[in-house]
């Protein structure tokens, strides 16, 4: 159970090898819904919020129209998916996804619970986005890998899917559709 607090290394390993299914606990879902509502209330009020309805960097004072917000977020993901080189092992990607889901389950990011549901649905369905080992940007060093992960979640790029014990490459939208998952 992913709750934002009690995830152990043993649980991460079990989920990554498929011996344990991960799901979002109801308390985390409630915290996430409250956090998301706070973001939506701010946006509904017309307030300008950096990175949600503005440009970035030098364009931070440019208000983006409501009809372009989804495109803004997708373009941000695409622009940061700039890794190179060999890809990470799919099991390691599944570990990364499980840990990210746990972090988001704390309920302080304003993200929709459905995004974490998709992350965990991908993990449980053994769908690992293709993430290059080399490269990142920003102070945290995780923007490129997380952007590659998110590319899979929006149905773009390539994923590895475990089929009969072997990892095979598929385009992300096909992998999601075959698993009955909707991209965000």
Residue ranges of model-derived segments:
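Conserved, well-structured ligand/cofactor-binding cores
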Residues: 1-184
């Amino acid at each position: 159970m992913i709750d934002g607090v009690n995830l152990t290394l043993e649980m991460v390993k079990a989920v990554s090898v498929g011996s344990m299914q991960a799901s979002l606990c109801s308390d985390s879902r409630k915290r996430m819904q409250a956090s998301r509502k706070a973001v939506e209330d701010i946006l509904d009020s017309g307030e300008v919020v950096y990175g949600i309805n503005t440009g970035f960097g030098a364009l931070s004072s440019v208000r983006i129209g409501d009809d372009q917000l989804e495109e803004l977020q997708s373009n941000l993901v695409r622009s940061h998916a700039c890794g190179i080189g060999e890809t990470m092992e799919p099991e390691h990607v599944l570990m990364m996804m499980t840990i990210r889901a746990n972090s988001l389950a704390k309920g302080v990011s304003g993200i929709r619970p459905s995004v974490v549901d998709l992350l965990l649905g991908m993990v449980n369905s053994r769908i690992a986005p293709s993430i290059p080992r080399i490269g990142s940007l920003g102070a945290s060093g995780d923007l490129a890998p997380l952007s590659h992960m998110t590319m899979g979640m929006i149905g773009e790029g390539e994923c590895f899917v475990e089929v009969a014990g072997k990892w095979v490459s598929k385009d992300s939208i096909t992998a999601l559709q075959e698993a009955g998952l909707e991209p965000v």
